């Protein structure tokens, strides 16, 4: 899973500061602290969503580049191993290639949606990312022996 860029504590701190600055702008006269908080929360949530979207896209693009390098390396290794091991390694290479293409498609979709990227698209991309990471880790430990 891709780690969140903004923690819940940081988010709450940002909301508190934004609410404070709202009250400060009106000279701490009038207004309602609850309304300040709710409006600040909406602003901060939007900013955090933008930050998280950019962070997710960056992580997925980095993962895609890593998967492409790993796939090239595994293809070279597969051609030089014994035929019995080659079949198993080739299945893993094919699986990694399939996952890489799914991730590439997800990244392309997220990039096209930009700020409008939905939670479903993000979850799907993260799921593919998790599977891809598992396969790369398993292959890395198997081929390093």
Name each region found by the language model.
Residues 1-145:
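Intrinsically disordered, low-complexity, basic-enriched segments
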């Amino acid at each position: 899973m891709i780690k969140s860029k903004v923690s819940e504590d940081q988010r709450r701190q940002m909301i508190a500061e934004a609410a404070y600055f709202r009250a400060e702008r009106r000279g701490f006269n009038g207004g309602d602290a609850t309304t300040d908080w709710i409006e600040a929360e909406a602003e901060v949530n939007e900013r955090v969503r933008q930050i998280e979207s950019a962070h997710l896209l960056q992580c997925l693009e980095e993962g895609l580049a890593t998967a492409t390098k790993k796939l090239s390396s595994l293809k070279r290794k597969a051609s030089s191993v014994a035929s019995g091991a080659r079949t198993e390694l080739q299945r893993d290479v094919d699986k990694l290639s399939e996952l890489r293409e799914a991730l590439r498609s997800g990244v392309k979709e997220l990039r096209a949606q930009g700020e409008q990227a939905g939670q479903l698209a993000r979850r799907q991309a993260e799921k593919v990312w998790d599977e891809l990471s598992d396969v790369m880790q398993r292959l890395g430990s198997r081929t390093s022996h």
